[in-house]
Amino acid sequence: GNSVKVKWFNEPTNLHTIWDSKMIDSQNLSYTEYANFILTGIDEVVLDKWKRDDVLTYSYESRDYRNQCYDYEGDNLSYNYIFKNKSLLEKRLLQGGLRLAGTLNRIFK
């Protein structure tokens, strides 16, 4: 994504930055508020499974989602891109946080 040059609401950037910060910042919530929102209604069984997943599982999932991330027309991304990818963004943020927590818990147990 770093080498994929695009615009975000007419501002030059790259696709990696859009996923790392621009879509998150566009929610206009604090990080705590956004984390609480993402956690709302998630099944505990799913959360526990994600905590136990290994790095290989995560990398395969990322590969499978790659086409969705690159599915856009033109080079000026905005509201439509958010609409198409917000649920995936939130899922990956949640999975990343849980998997990091699970890994750290296993290391320091």
Could you describe each region identified by the protein language model?
Residues 1-3:
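Active-site beta-strand/loop microenvironment that shapes enzyme catalytic pockets
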Residues 5-91:
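An amphipathic alpha-helical core segment
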Residues 24, 105-109:
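Sec-exported extracytoplasmic/periplasmic mature domains
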Residues 100:
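Divalent metal-coordination and catalytic microenvironments
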